Amino acid sequence: MASQGTKRSYEQMETGGERQNATEIRASVGRMVGGIGRFYVQMCTELKLSDHEGRLIQNSITIERMVLSAFDERRNKYLEEHPSAGKDPKKTGGPIYRRRDGKWVRELILYDKEEIMRIWRQANNGEDATAGLTHLMIWHSNLNDTTYQRTRALVRTGMDPRMCSLMQGSTLPRRSGAAGAAVKGVGTMVMELIQMIKRGINDRNFWRGENGRRTRIAYERMCNILKGKFQTAAQRAMMDQVRESRNPGNAEIEDLIFLARSALILRGSVAHKSCLPACVYGLTVASGYDFEREGYSLIGIDPFKLLQNSQVFSLIRPNENPAHKSQLVWMACHSAAFEDLRVSNFIRGTKVVPRGQLATRGVQIASNENMETMDSCTLELRSRYWAIRTRSGGNTNQQRASAGQISVQPTFSVQRNLPFERATIMAAFTGNTEGRTSDMRTEIIRMMENARSEDVSFQGRGVFELSDEKATNPIVPSLDMSNEGSYFFGDNAEEYDN
């Protein structure tokens, strides 16, 4: 990529830093996760959680959500201006699960947001540490991506539900900054832009006045983020058209949907990073490990090593399968919801099955669920190998893929062919090449038709033994090329509802 020199690595985005060398990046990412860990340890002390309770992923999620809510300025301001019954804008809380007389009981806790912010800042050398907050948001986003399908959201914006492999990060808040933008899939960006354009169509003042000027700046910035994800000149040129449109409307929506479809074959660059639940960093900090001194990377071996040595528990409902619950969380930890299952399988070293075959619902427990029947299990989050997470979509070629999901978005930088369902995808492109973007559309369709199944992505890249920390001996897995590996294959995952 020609523009590589101007890009910050997403480790730098993650920590809000300017360009740094590798050691500085490792130190600042280490400082970030160390701060999360210290915060978690302190919260466990505040809440008097036992060791077992502190390792419960549901408790971790509640604590993470509390700190995110405490720092959500826009929502806090909104709550103060629009007081709703029963919501104290100055407080935050959630369910904490404790072990009492051999049973799990739910306790709803409430804390001052001020107090939570104080504890967070104290754990982060007195700073706001927005990078750490974004990191937690990305972990929640990865968990959502793995747990839910976004069919309804796709249909609502006029996209095809089978394009779910493009929807990484679709539940990330807009305030997640550059690190959040880096992990958003092409479909997510398209969806955000379409929602914006639709508001403009329905509300004539949307683009007008001082507010409209800010809206316009946000629109162009989102267009540029999406443009930066595309790897071909024609796709980028089409994004320029969309961005420069005087009055964005249905023509732009058409163009964006066209571009989203094209990304199923001409994949965009979407960053992947392993973001772990706060309790994992907490356990590591509590054991005396110094993240900042040792350094840390979100895309290397470090998260794998952490998960090899961490015991995390989860509440489990009566008819759920602990192995399946573990798979769900493992995939979320490595941001592998849209990765080819053949690759995930090889790295994890245990069978990774499609979402529809998992006997498990989401990790979080609804407030009306009966705690009497709840049990807990150990999550098996270890792996057989590790691999570097990719920020590119890989080059493109063609293979059989499944009914429910017709393409993948690679997570691991591992040599393989990238499956997609050519016939299904191309069927959507019939006779729609008129209008001002016709030459670009024609060019994009030509490239898609020429994508070949022999092409291999991530040539020579492999997985590594966990003892191979410096990544010196890549093992290129032999994947069954006849088999495809879509996770949301013909699926019945629950919808994500805000």
Curated annotation (Swiss-Prot):
Gene Ontology biological-process annotations: symbiont entry into host cell; viral penetration into host nucleus
Motif Bipartite nuclear localization signal: positions: 198-216
UniProt keyword annotations, A-Z: Capsid protein, Helical capsid protein, Host nucleus, Host-virus interaction, Ribonucleoprotein, RNA-binding, Viral nucleoprotein, Viral penetration into host nucleus, Virion, Virus entry into host cell
InterPro entries noted in UniProt: Flu_NP (IPR002141)
Predominant location: virion
Keyword RNA-binding in annotation: yes
Motif Unconventional nuclear localization signal: chain residues: 1-18
Maturation and modification: Late in virus-infected cells, may be cleaved from a 56-kDa protein to a 53-kDa protein by a cellular caspase. This cleavage might be a marker for the onset of apoptosis in infected cells or have a specific function in virus host interaction.
Region (Disordered): 1-21
Alphabetized GO MF terms: RNA binding; structural molecule activity
Pfam families cross-referenced by the UniProt entry: Flu_NP
GO CC terms of this entry: helical viral capsid; host cell; host cell nucleus; ribonucleoprotein complex; viral nucleocapsid
Location in or out of the cell: Virion; Host nucleus
Family membership noted in the UniProt record: Belongs to the influenza viruses nucleoprotein family.
Subunit structure: Homomultimerizes to form the nucleocapsid. May bind host exportin-1/XPO1. Binds to viral genomic RNA. Protein-RNA contacts are mediated by a combination of electrostatic interactions between positively charged residues and the phosphate backbone and planar interactions between aromatic side chains and bases.
Role of this protein: Encapsidates the negative strand viral RNA, protecting it from nucleases. The encapsidated genomic RNA is termed the ribonucleoprotein (RNP) and serves as template for transcription and replication. The RNP needs to be localized in the host nucleus to start an infectious cycle, but is too large to diffuse through the nuclear pore complex. NP comprises at least 2 nuclear localization signals that are responsible for the active RNP import into the nucleus through cellular importin alpha/beta pathway.
UniProt-recorded name of the protein: Nucleoprotein
Species whose genome carries this gene: Influenza A virus (strain A/Equine/Miami/1/1963 H3N8)
Lineage: Viruses, Riboviria, Orthornavirae, Negarnaviricota, Polyploviricotina
